[in-house]
Amino acid sequence: MECGGALQLPPGFRFHPTDDELVMYYLCRKCGGLPLAAPVIAEVDLYKFNPWDLPERAMGGEKEWYFFSPRDRKYPNGQRPNRAAGTGYWKATGADKPVGSPRAVAIKKALVFYAGKPPKGVKTNWIMHEYRLADVDRSAAARKLSKSSHNALRLDDWVLCRIYNKKGVIERYDTVDAGEDVKPAAAAAAAKGGRIGGGGGAAAMKVELSDYGFYDQEPESEMLCFDRSGSADRDSMPRLHTDSSGSEHVLSPSPSPDDFPGGGDHDYAESQPSGGCGGWPGVDWAAVGDDGFVIDSSLFELPSPAAFSRAAGDGAAFGDMFTYLQKPF
């Protein structure tokens, strides 16, 4: 199929090439001035946009998008690329990976997008894999020779990029003023009927999800959260949430003063194993604290030698031990 024509594929087909296929059949042909088999990769200057604005500029894709982009240099006569993009910047992470065997044809670099201005940018979930040709002379002398040939952009200045979000959704991070603080788009939240929760700082930053609106950070699994009302409302019980599969936490109604010795109005939570029977035998309910938890003082007492004598029938075996424990150190 001629490059530039309409791409017609049956339903169910996805563009999901490997690293070697991206380099051999797309990057090398692009840098060699050869046409591609199908127009599946758009030419976009990635450093003019935020990553969440790129999916709509791609030829296609659902959770990852591919682009040919020119290499923008930080300095006119240098080789260091300019990583500023949109309202943030891309930052390299990890080591470069050679692509091709036995000889590397290209270099794969992983980058993470930070919203805001360095060095206070907020790390996002947007990832870019940049593929560039290996063993290419990008020195100032080579570029000067290229300009003398009236080439505004050398073919080997093209890079192939894969963009995706680790969460599989389109997250938007909006900045205010000079990009010092990164905040969600409140106007977009109001338009979508989303919600913005409390909290501050980068760790609690809310983001806009194109599929799910706004979200707050959810508690991690294995966390217990008691949502208890005020002390004035003694009839309302604390709500217990748990992800643990080892036991079931059952909320019981407040016992009446006639049910337990000592009387009083106490809230309590009863924990019983799965498939087992409830009840804590031997618990002094009069010792229940105001916070709703049972404190059995007998659990913290040191057994006396007499108790061991009754258990073992002869306390002589434990006499020396208790004599030693009672000595000051």
Swiss-Prot record:
Disordered as annotated region, ranges: 228-281
Q: Which GO terms describe its cellular component?
A: nucleus
- What InterPro entries does the database record attribute to this sequence? NAC-dom (IPR003441), NAC_dom_sf (IPR036093)
The record, for PROSITE patterns, names: NAC
Query: Where mainly found?
Result: nucleus
**What keywords would UniProt list here?**
Activator, DNA-binding, Nucleus, Stress response, Transcription, Transcription regulation
Which residue intervals define the domain NAC in the entry? 9-166
Tissue expression pattern: Expressed in roots and embryo. Weakly expressed in callus.
Question: For this UniProt entry, which segments traverse the membrane?
Answer: none
* Protein's job: Transcription activator that binds to the promoter of the stress response gene LEA19. Involved in tolerance to abiotic stresses.
What's the domain remark here?
The NAC domain includes a DNA binding domain and a dimerization domain.
User: Mind telling me what this protein is named?
Assistant: NAC domain-containing protein 71
Organism of provenance: Oryza sativa subsp. japonica
Q: Gene symbol?
A: NAC071
